[in-house]
């Protein structure tokens, strides 16, 4: 298959005002996507966004390009990424377009696509869009131009969908939950879902101003949530990222719970309830402790490439339901086609109800191996992973670990970073090994 030129592992992403996140490129991308969709005989797409100020500019540019290709647009306004995937299916739209850079700062943005079935676009379709991006843009005749309108009840529809996955016989009454929405796309949704299911809710990160998304809050910055949980003596905390597809949690004692621990709790509870179908899919970054703990319980476990799209592909291939990443993407195909932070949180709350345990007790049997991740920035034309010095130091560290840990080096699919991950039983040694490799990677970028 051809190499992608514009699309990364999660659509097109970058700094606003710098190629490819410019109004000119967004118009062309809308047109190219519209041409591909129009060729399939479909004429409407949904467009949603997170709360970045640049979202208004990009949605207007996309709409212009789509209209020129003869494709109409239904605007959803601020909407979590998984909400856009869900509504794309229920509205029988040709595609859903998400304007978001997920957990990145406000000055970044991105554009990604869902197919009509709520899954990420197949590689072949993305490549066809890329091919058209390199062709001159044209415009349909006036009678065939796409038209735009807004869907005013989109948030309410998604709230009801989220509530529908929480079993009717259960309630959140008696639970005090702090929810941090990262000043992002879930700000008007997650607190309402939890309240309508009976919880007492304290909300933070729910005052977006276009520039504060993910700023010292949300799933990538847990300190604010930890402090609020302890201050209010809440039962637990839930942190979502800017577009709502990632979740982290905090116990009543302020202890952070990541995606690996959430997968462990959900898998074990599903097994106890006789509801686990097949096994669990993680990624190359999944903590080795999860693999070992699931093996003890005879729950199959496989690793996919990093990226929720690859986890989903592996789940579909094996007809399993449960998978995710330590970063907080958690997928349950029984409920949704993509990772959904709100739904993953509701599943954990349901597990607490079923097991009659607090979040602290539900997660206390799982002990992660020390894992250190160092990001090394590099110029896009460099190839540090091909360096013989880097390969040599990796072999040296793997030999020293002697099968009690792992080393993983990989390029980020969304940023110009090399991710250096080392895992093992001794935290001090793991830190030293990771720094040793990172230093060599950095030297190879100069």
UniProtKB/Swiss-Prot annotation:
Report the enzyme's class at the first EC level: isomerase
Q: How is it modified after translation?
A: Activated by phosphorylation.
UniProt cross-references to PROSITE patterns, sorted A to Z = PGM_PMM (PS00710)
Q: Which GO terms describe its biological process?
A: carbohydrate metabolic process; peptidoglycan biosynthetic process; UDP-N-acetylglucosamine biosynthetic process
According to the UniProt entry, what is the EC number of this protein? 5.4.2.10
**What are its cofactors?**
Mg(2+)
Would you tell me the Gene Ontology cellular component terms?
Answer: cytosol
List positions binding Mg(2+): 102, 241, 243, 245
Q: What is this protein called?
A: Phosphoglucosamine mutase
């Amino acid at each position: 298959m051809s190499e992608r030129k514009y699309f990364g592992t999660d659509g097109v992403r970058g700094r606003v005002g710098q190629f490819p996140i410019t109004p000119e490129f967004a118009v062309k991308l809308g047109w190219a996507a519209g041409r591909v969709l129009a060729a399939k005989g479909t004429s409407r797409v949904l467009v949603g966004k997170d709360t970045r100020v640049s979202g208004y500019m990009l949605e207007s540019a996309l709409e212009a390009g789509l209209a020129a290709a003869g494709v109409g647009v239904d605007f959803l306004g601020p909407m979590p990424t998984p909400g856009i995937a869900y509504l794309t299916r229920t509205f029988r739209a040709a595609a859903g377009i998400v304007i978001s850079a997920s957990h990145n700062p406000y000055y970044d943005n991105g554009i990604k696509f869902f197919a009509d079935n709520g899954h990420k676009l197949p590689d072949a379709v993305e490549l066809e869009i890329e091919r058209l991006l390199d062709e001159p843009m044209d415009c349909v005749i006036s009678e065939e131009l796409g038209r735009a309108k807004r869907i005013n009840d989109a948030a309410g529809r998604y709230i009801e969908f989220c509530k529908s996955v929480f079993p009717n016989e259960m309630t959140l009454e008696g639970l005090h939950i702090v929810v941090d929405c990262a000043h992002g796309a879930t700000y008007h949704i997650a607190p309402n879902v939890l309240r309508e299911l009976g919880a007492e809710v304290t909300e933070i990160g729910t005052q977006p101003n276009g520039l504060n998304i993910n700023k010292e809050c949300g799933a990538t910055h847990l300190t604010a949530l930890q402090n609020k949980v302890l201050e209010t003596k809440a039962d637990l905390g839930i942190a979502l990222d800017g577009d709502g597809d990632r979740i982290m949690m905090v116990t009543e004692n302020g202890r952070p719970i990541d995606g690996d621990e959430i997968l462990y709790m959900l898998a074990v509870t599903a097994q106890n309830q006789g509801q686990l179908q097949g096994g669990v899919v993680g990624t190359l970054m999944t903590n080795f402790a999860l693999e070992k703990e699931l093996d003890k319980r005879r729950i199959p476990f496989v690793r996919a490439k990093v990226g929720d799209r690859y986890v989903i592909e592996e789940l579909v291939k094996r007809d399993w339901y449960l998978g995710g990443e330590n970063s907080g993407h958690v997928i349950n195909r029984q409920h949704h086609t993509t990772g959904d932070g709100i739904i993953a949180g509701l599943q954990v709350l349901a597990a607490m109800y079923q097991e009659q345990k607090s979040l602290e007790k539900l997660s206390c049997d799982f002990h992660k191996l020390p894992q250190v991740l160092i990001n090394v920035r590099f110029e896009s034309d460099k190839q540090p992973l091909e360096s013989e010095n880097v390969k040599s130091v990796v072999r040296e560290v793997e030999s020293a670990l002697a099968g009690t840990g792992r080393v993983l080096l990989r390029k980020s699919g969304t940023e110009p970073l090399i991710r250096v991950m080392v895992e093992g039983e001794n935290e001090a040694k793991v830190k030293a090994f990771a720094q040793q490799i990172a230093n060599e990677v950095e030297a190879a970028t100069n």
